[in-house]
């Protein structure tokens, strides 16, 4: 999509400190942590029924499969970088890292929906839990993951995948009357009315983060930083301003920072009447992320942990 190309161009031009890399493609084995083997095979072999393809929203092609694998793989790479689980002797937790696309939260274990084929947040959460366990063994607590989904649409696929999984907490603020019209119950869902503006939105977010803090202690946050709550979005039906969305991101990044919880984020939805507005919302998120990445690099937190990692600086992915 054009917005992704525009975002890459602006990040390269205006935020040269941000290091980017090609998104790796998630393997069948990695995808199978969140999706059934039968569904993966049907997608990759082009054998999904016509009704299933209509639910996804675009036609099958080999390029679609590759793009979907890489969308999931990019969130995996961001989560690895945030936690410091990437390969190499220079692996150090970045604290904050990103996927310039992703946020495919309508995909469930058995089907895609709403332009989402594979659920990148779910794949990344499960894979990071597995890799964390292999690295640290029984001497460290299992990795708990919070998915903070602030796309305007409820993350129904994510909620369904983790319905019986107490190690992953799903939090979603979304439009009550927006897609999907049949919501899935997550761990914490907050419905917002059409036309919701900055002040009530931020009050709801404060309440949600307070409740998350009360009920769960994550070792990783996966944040879906949707641009579609913006007042100029064609599909969002909410009315947040640029400043309101900056304040939203600030709250999430600060919440994670105060608890020294690494955070990986994906850009998720954004369908502005003016595409430049969508990209500006996303750029604002990147600028804030860079500021928090700097805090992580200046912090002595990771140097005080008993981790078999050799610290060297990394930039957001």
Predicted feature descriptions by range:
Residues 21, 32, 99:
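Short, conserved beta-strand segments within well-ordered enzyme catalytic domains
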Residues 4, 40, 72-75:
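A general structural signal for well-ordered alpha-helical segments in protein cores
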Residues 1-26:
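N-terminal low-complexity, Ser/Thr- and acidic-residue-enriched intrinsically disordered segments
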Residues 18-28, 264-273:
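Acidic carboxylate-rich catalytic motifs and surrounding loops in phosphoryl-/glycosyl-chemistry enzymes
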């Amino acid at each position: 999509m054009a917005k992704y190309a525009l975002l890459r161009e602006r990040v390269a031009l205006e935020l040269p400190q941000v290091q980017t890399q090609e998104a790796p493609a998630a393997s069948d084995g990695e995808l199978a942590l969140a999706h059934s083997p039968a569904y993966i095979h049907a997608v990759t072999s082009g054998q999904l029924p016509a009704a299933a393809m209509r639910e996804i929203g675009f036609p099958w092609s080999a390029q679609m499969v590759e793009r979907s694998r890489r969308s999931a793989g990019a969130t995996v790479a961001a989560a690895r970088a945030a936690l410091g689980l990437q390969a190499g002797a220079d692996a150090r937790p970045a604290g904050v890292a990103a996927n310039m696309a992703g946020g495919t939260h309508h995909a469930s274990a058995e089907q895609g929906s709403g332009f989402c084929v594979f659920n990148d947040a779910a794949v990344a959460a499960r894979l990071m839990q597995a890799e964390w366990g292999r690295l640290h063994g029984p001497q460290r607590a299992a990795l708990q993951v919070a998915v903070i989904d602030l796309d305007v649409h409820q993350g129904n696929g994510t909620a369904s995948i983790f319905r019986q999984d107490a190690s992953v907490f799903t939090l979603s603020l979304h439009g009550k009357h927006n897609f999907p019209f049949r919501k899935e119950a997550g761990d914490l869902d907050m419905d917002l009315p059409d036309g919701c503006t900055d002040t009530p939105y931020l009050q709801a977010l404060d309440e949600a983060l307070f409740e998350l803090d009360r009920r769960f202690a994550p070792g990783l946050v996966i944040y879906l930083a949707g641009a579609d709550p913006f007042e100029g979005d064609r599909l969002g039906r909410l009315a947040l301003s640029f400043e309101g969305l900056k304040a939203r991101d600030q709250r999430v990044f600060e919440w994670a920072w105060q608890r020294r919880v690494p955070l990986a984020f994906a850009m998720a939805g954004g369908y502005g009447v003016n595409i430049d507005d969508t990209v500006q919302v996303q750029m604002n998120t990147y600028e804030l992320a860079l500021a928090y990445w700097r805090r992580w690099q200046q912090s002595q937190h990771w140097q005080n942990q008993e981790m078999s990692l050799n610290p060297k600086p990394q930039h957001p992915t």
